[in-house]
Amino acid sequence: MALTKAEMSEYLFEKLGLSKRDAKELVELFFEEVRRALENGEQVKLSGFGNFDLRDKNQRPGRNPKTGEDIPITARRVVTFRPGQKLKSRVENASPKE
């Protein structure tokens, strides 16, 4: 099971008493701000949660798994996430739900 933006909105609606529309807009604005920061090359630091960083990957040789043909994998920029210590310890100490 995955946590969705709709579930986040519903949680804000229930816990904070926001209207469903405002809760949905708040979630959308949060993710849009994270996207905007990353598009502008900025690091996103969420205290107690973790950091989103950008990393440039160089071009490298690759291979088509079907044909075995050598193909170059182009240079690109990727988003990485590094969990913070608080998040790591909470996840490590959580009991798995089935």
Swiss-Prot record:
The keyword DNA-binding applies. It holds the Pfam family Bac_DNA_binding. InterPro entries: Hist_DNA-bd (IPR000119), Histone-like_DNA-bd_CS (IPR020816), IHF-like_DNA-bd_dom_sf (IPR010992), IHF_alpha (IPR005684). Residues 49-71 are annotated as: Disordered. Belongs to the bacterial histone-like protein family. This protein is one of the two subunits of integration host factor, a specific DNA-binding protein that functions in genetic recombination as well as in transcriptional and translational control. This is Integration host factor subunit alpha. It comes from Pectobacterium atrosepticum (strain SCRI 1043 / ATCC BAA-672). The gene is ihfA.
